[in-house]
Amino acid sequence: MKLPAAAGDAIVIGPNAVRLIKSWGEQLCEEIEPHLSNATHAEMLDHHDRFIVRHELAGRGKGWFTNRGRLISILYEHARKLGIDIRLGSRVTKYWEEDGRAGVIVNDRERLAADCVICADGVHSAARAWLTGQVDTQQHSGWANFRAHMTTEQLAKDPEASWVLQGTREKDRVYVWFGDGINLAIMTMKRGQELAWALMHTDKFNAHESWAGGRASIDDALATLSPWPGRLRPSSVIRHTLPEKLVDHALIYRPPLDTWVSAGGRVMLIGDAAHPYFPVVGQGGSQAIEDGVVVATALELAGKENVPLALRIRATLTEENNVLMEAGNSRYPRATVIQLGSSTLQEHLFWPDWEAVAKDPSVFAFPNPEWILGHDCREYTHQVFDTVVRAVRGEGEYIPRNIPADGAYRVEDTYSPE
């Protein structure tokens, strides 16, 4: 089974995760870099297509913006070169945890056992239901997001649409339009060779929470923009989208879980399975990468011989059988603050206070929080590992230093790249 290299639309990887990927090797980064957008700013416009302000993108040029499928394909090939056993098309049909081991049943037939199981099975996680014993607590937000990716050959030939490629041979462009309950972003990549767009709207078309597609219509996307007096320019671009490349993705809110770690301490949720975000916060992929690195670092610090074998996390605790609990405890506050913040930011941007915007266009500025973008989760895990282990054993207190002191997410401009 081969991954489709250009599947999906686009993904943002923040500087906090880019630093981690860069640590995996120079050759890997050389493969990724030709596919990135080199845009550094975005033009903010209203629904009349009137210019509001030009803002610097989140990450101050240290983050990545690229095609989702291509990035995943490159990372997949990198993992294969490392000799990692990846089995595409293998469906996990059951999870188990018993007698000092944990594992999965694949395709209702093959039983696999391991020291621990890390579950990264996304927003529809079967592992989450097994681990928590809860039915999915999803709540439809009422929002959906048309999303698409395209190459730009046809745009260049269309006099009405070619405006979006002006200047992109030197610098990619980002345009963001705001209207009441509607938000549109158009972003070029690879010096104008590719383009992605995303149209946030109230869900009137029975959108699905799936990247595999479902019913999505270009006509519906264009109709969503029909009330805008300034729809001509963005519509000229959207209409070139191939139907098979369009997704209308429902935005589903899921409240934070009580825990990501199983009672036996051998099974853990990470990524969207643990803490799904709204895309507006631009940290979904980055926080998933942080999850993986923190778990790997915690396992490395404990050593294979110290991964829990018989004792349960909630029984007599020692450092050995706290390794996944340590990873969960150090990650949970940080990921949860960002998860809750994504909901707040969603409302803030999609029902703008136009009087406030007229007085201060910075209300549309991209979040640039130092505590998110400047964070080195690997170094932090080394620093707090022993403290968190002692806290789990009841021998002290762990006070997170990777979130704001009051635990509140704010739109702030505090990030200073190294």
Curated annotation (Swiss-Prot):
Sequence positions that bind FAD: V12, R68, D272, G285
Induction summary: Expression is positively regulated by brlA, a conidiation-specific transcription factor involved in the early stage of asexual development and necessary for conidiophore formation. Expression is also induced by the cell wall integrity (CWI) signaling pathway that includes the mitogen-activated protein kinase mpkA and the transcription factor rlmA. Expression is negatively regulated by the transcription factor sebA.
Pfam families the UniProt entry points to: FAD_binding_3
GO molecular function terms attached to this record: FAD binding; monooxygenase activity
Pathway(s) per entry: Alkaloid biosynthesis
Protein EC: 1.-.-.-
Active site: R147
GO biological process: fumiquinazoline C biosynthetic process
Knocked-out gene: effects: Abolishes the production of fumiquinazoline A and C and shows a 19-fold accumulation in fumiquinazoline F production.
Similarity comment text for this entry: Belongs to the paxM FAD-dependent monooxygenase family.
Name of the protein in question: FAD-dependent monooxygenase fmqB
Primary gene name: fmqB
